[in-house]
């Protein structure tokens, strides 16, 4: 798998999440982008049981077996299974990528995630809010404004230390690029960039990207959001323990 393919996978994973760092700086303004608007909501929905199974496959069974599971409905995410260990597994859609991601509205994206307790408490609320607003028909600028207002009013939590996201499902579809998938872990940090982690450097195994945008040019208000970076480290196994293509 090439580094560019890894970058594209990272972008589509978030649910966030992304690494087109230097390859598509003007993607949001590209008139040829393949998914300019939201598809009919039916195209984003899944069979209930299939979605639960895919969500659980994001992490090894030792983690996901006792995790809560949420599934997408026409109005947002709802709890399908109450867990015991504080983890939450779910299947993110394309709109959990950065707001200017070219595959933001890609209805094929199915990004299985399992969030540890700190991420479930402090990252997932943003996914709930974003999804609810988009499914209600709000535009991206309206969603951005609503999220900023919720942050300012402390209706959305600050990031907790130690927030981690497992994305090791063999069944995920993260992007139209490359082989569409790749197992990895993601770490959330209140950092403006990846310099302190040595991310995005030649031969570094760590990739990093801004959580909110590729380039703030399309949505300048995002520059006023709290700094949040996502760090990705590829792994060599799927969640079931079988070998995966090298990242």
Which sequence ranges carry the predicted segments?
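Primary mode marks residue(s) on the alpha4-beta5-alpha5 output face of response regulator receiver
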Residues: 29-247
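Bacterial N-terminal signal peptides that target proteins for export
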Residues: 2-13
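Bacterial N-terminal signal peptides
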Residues: 12-21
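Sec/Tat signal peptide C-region and signal peptidase I cleavage site
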Residues: 24-28
